[in-house]
Amino acid sequence: MRTLPLRAGVLVGAMLITMLLPSSPAHAAPTLASRMAAVQNANVINYYPSNAGWTFMWTNFDVIRVHADLNQAAWLGADTVRVIVFPQTFGYPVPSAAYTQKLDTVIDVAESNGLNVKLTLFDWWSGYSDVANSIAWAQTLLAPYANDPRVIAVELKNEIPPNDATAINWARQLIPAVRTTAPTMPLTLTVDGTSGATGMATLKAQLAGTPLDYYDFHFYGASERSLAEIRRAQDAVAPTPMVIGETGVSTVSGTEGEQGAYLARVFRAAAEAGVGSVAPWTLNDFAQGAIPPNSTVSTQPAQYKFGLYRTDASPKIAASVVDDAWTTGTTSNSILNLGFEAAAADSPWRQYQPQAGAAVITTESPRTGSQSARFSGTTRAGSNLPSLVTSPITPVQAGQQWHAEAYARGVAATGITEISMSWFTISGTWISQHTSNRLPTGNSSWTKLSVDAVAPAGAASVQLHLKSGDNTGTVYYDDVAIS
């Protein structure tokens, strides 16, 4: 991943110069078509400062930090930043001039870093019965940007409840009113990740008379099933275009390697589905105290660790995944750590049935490189053998041919040592498995275990298991491949 070129002193100087420059020259007015083209291909980063999340971004506004962060996002490959505003913070029903100036500054700073802006309105909002003031507030806030090509789209409400009749009535009136103010501005609404495709279908059906320009999918499901989930969401809103406006996984309970693999799978699945815009949540982790304490979000430990960067601005491995996806259009299988050479924090391998024997990474007996995985003194859990498990970056589709292999070596090995591919439906229901040849018991040299299979009907994901159970001796694994 490329390194950020600016240092603090240079950055402050650059920012001060930027603030003293005259206003930017007038831009050519955008069309709905030009904005929609930008929306469907945007490299969007979700953003709050690491020390000032949600409403604190505005109440504790720090233009120098915003400039530094957006410069970092641009070097990562982002070309658009999502900016979220809050009626209660900005002033409602009349926006405060002080806060609209802060918004204008953020848009200017984004432009200075080569970034467009997607605006989200009415976050942390439930005042759906106040339609008239909602319309007036939105029109006042958006009027300066109606013909500003730096603002490419507006999400009217973040994660609207699709089964709330009052909320839907509010949206039905807000959509045409905003269009009178900004007729070339693409408009969207989102539902939460739990509602998913079902919620999107419900929303679309209820807005048939006031349709949205595109749909924005918030995806936090199992990444190995992301292609099936993305296609289900597309089907729910077809033929209206769809982008992925939020996706990611927290590192509070999983490794940073798992986060990197998660995003690699989503980017690759989106490309397969023809979705050209994927927006990771979020640029930074959040420091303790950075999320407003009056919010439910602040009580959820996972919310503090979704960032591509840690709070000290150092990158997690997921940052390199996003960098590659945005700047080269590719996602590498190297994130899977198939040779066990990565640091533990950067490995996406997970333990399955560790109570029956957990694998450890060791330098004792590598086949290639300097490390391998070792099982010793394992048992079993019912019919299940302990294993290391991962899933490929390439999405699964029924009828595909798959091959997996790994090299194993035994030292006084007993029991069963094999690899397997386990297939699952879109809902995570196990379908079947295919297993490899087994490693001979006793002492053995490095032996290739391999399995070939066709993804069965209904398969949406596959797990690769490296197993060793009922083993009173030791088994080493190295040099795994799956394709």
What feature does the model see in each segment?
Residues 1-28:
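Secretory targeting and sorting signals
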Residues 267-339:
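Aromatic- and carboxylate-lined catalytic core of secreted/periplasmic carbohydrate-active enzymes
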Residues 30-212:
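Active-site mouth of glycoside hydrolases
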